Amino acid sequence: MNDTFMKTKPVFPLLVSMALPNVISMLVNSLYNIVDSLFVARINEQAMTALSLVFPVQNLINAISIGFGIGINAQIALYLGAGDREKADISATHGMALSMLHGLLCTVIGIAIMPGFLRRFTTDESLVSMGVLYTTIVFLFSIVNMADLAFEKMFQAVGRMKTTMAALIAGCVCNIVLDPVLIFGLGPVPALGIAGAALATNFGQFVTFCIYLSCYSTADLPVRLRRKHLRPNAALDSKLYAIGIPAILNLALPSLLVTFLNGLLAAFSQSYVTVLGIYYKLQTFLYLPANGIVQGMRPLVGYNYGAKEHGRVAKLYRLTLGLSAAIMAVGTVLCLTISGSLIGLFSSNPETIAIGAKALRIICLGFIVSAVSTTSSGALEGLGKGVPSLVISLCRYVLFIMPLAWLLCRAFGPTGVWHAFWITEVCSAAIAFVVYRKAVAKK
């Protein structure tokens, strides 16, 4: 298969062709996240709170799979752009093997730490029990999840975006269909409650894996997994981790942030913890499609950077920034106009709806400007510049928001936490612009 279209096709149709399947699959994935939470919320508000409490650890494991996958994606694209097919094959082979090893480690460690982790935030043993049950089932499929992401990034690196779209949509649809059946029961299928939600997630991931495996076996790809490359290669593995570790940290930092914010908000009421969890479910409907555009850009900037096409890299960055900002503008309008209705999808508690509506109207003020940070971070990852990308994420998730949330919470209560979000996005965008310009200047 010829992959030179990445440096010859006009930039706008090229980005659209690469990003649109990602945006569609991310929208479907966002819909799954919303629908899954809606079904869990119908069990009771306690179940929704349990999901909010386990979110940081679950997000951390997802961060490991996606972040290391970004390293795989960047290395394959860079080597293909430079015309080195063998190193691209080695990157793919080692990336898949290491991803599955990560999955095994996450299963063992994740199951072991969850009871103690949950008891740090609640004394309600029924909440702990629900959280442990859900995560134990989900974590047992960590190897499948890791393999899914390795395949996804490999297909994206060679421009096979429609394959990733089909695999992700099939898994999400399976999940959405099975959620009500396994949670509430149907015919001979018993009602499994929150365990049913976890099982539906696992079945969806397995369907995605089967589709990737089938497509890989039948497709003519410019990169292949080869048994002969399964031997130690410290130099190449170090490059995978040099990009993957900062990317993992980028994605894991929200887990650290949510854990920190849960600690602040739990001192006031569990309703605030629930609202934070609902917000993170809702914001995926914006950030995942925007991330779909960034995912489409990432292999393109990597390929063109490897091919010394720096002008095309700059055009791709500007176009991605504009499209991402447009998506975030839509989200801002929705949160300002129908915030109460959005929160009401997940809770019938009047107190939770009132708190959540106010939170959304404040937090959304930083949505549009956040496009600068997300685009800059994604472009830097595609260029193989993991450390500058990590600096941007540290600003967004640690250096600005944590001190601001703590100070403003002490001064204004929980409302101060919501204001910390948009202030952080404004400050981080300024830093991101400077960091990106300096990083790409070093060619």
Regions inferred by a protein language model and the residue ranges of each:
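Transmembrane helical elements of multi-pass membrane transporters/channels
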Residues: 17-36, 137, 171, 204-208, ...
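Residue-level signal for short hydrophobic patches within transmembrane helices
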Residues: 8, 12-31, 35, 57-64, ...
